[in-house]
Amino acid sequence: IDACLVGSEMCIRDRPNNIIISSSTSGFMMSEIQTRCSTPERTVIGHPFNPPYILPLVEVVGGKKTSKSAVQWAFDFFKFSGKEPLILKKEVPGFVATRLQEALWREALHMVDNGEASPSDIDKALINGPAPRMVVQGQCMAFHVACGEGGMATNLDQFGPALKWPWTRLQAPELTTELRDKMVNGCNEMAGDTNFEILASKRDEAIVSVLNALKKKS
């Protein structure tokens, strides 16, 4: 982190004050990087996902001293560049995608270590199961559509107790009313006025397209 701090200050020192300075770090938080910056308000993280020349995601993260205008400028820049930027609502190590990936990775390591599955078993399960579906809808929307008209509300009310079951080594958060409402409202907002049957139909068509494309490739 010390080298990163020195490098960031050297970079900023030679740039005009109206230039946004972006870091592609995948681990450090901008609040740490900008501690020695003379103009920290223009420093922001633009974290791509590997391979960045194919995948469109870029996570935009400001630090405690980053200005809102710098965050918005970075978002607009990546959007104009053809990427799909995502502004984090709150600074957190690992951002969004890496934290989700790390959770999956750690559970996979546990399964291999305990002799429950081989690396090949794990990849086969993902490739032929949740992965194609997640390409189409993502984790939250997939569970929302899976419960029909009731959506995420039905999912959490019916399967909420399963969060205490030993299906993962990760400890689940308490399913409070606030957390339930955030999930339900978020999924309803994504779905909009589209009926769940249409959402499910579009999901199925897209998954078939993904699977057919993979078959042709192999």
Task: Identify the function of each model-found stretch.
Residues 102, 112-114:
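AAA+ ATPase "lid" subdomain C-terminal helix
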Residues 77, 110-111:
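Residues within well-ordered alpha helices
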Residues 15-16:
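Helix-to-beta-strand junctions that scaffold the AdoMet/dcAdoMet cofactor pocket
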Residues 80-83, 87, 114-218:
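NAD(P)-dependent Rossmann-like dehydrogenase/reductase catalytic/cofactor-binding core
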Residues 1-7, 12:
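Single conserved hydrophobic/aromatic residue that forms the stacking wall/gate
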Residues 20-90, 94, 98:
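Rossmann-fold dinucleotide-binding core
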Residues 97, 101-107:
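Structural/interface elements that position substrates and couple domains in central-metabolism enzymes
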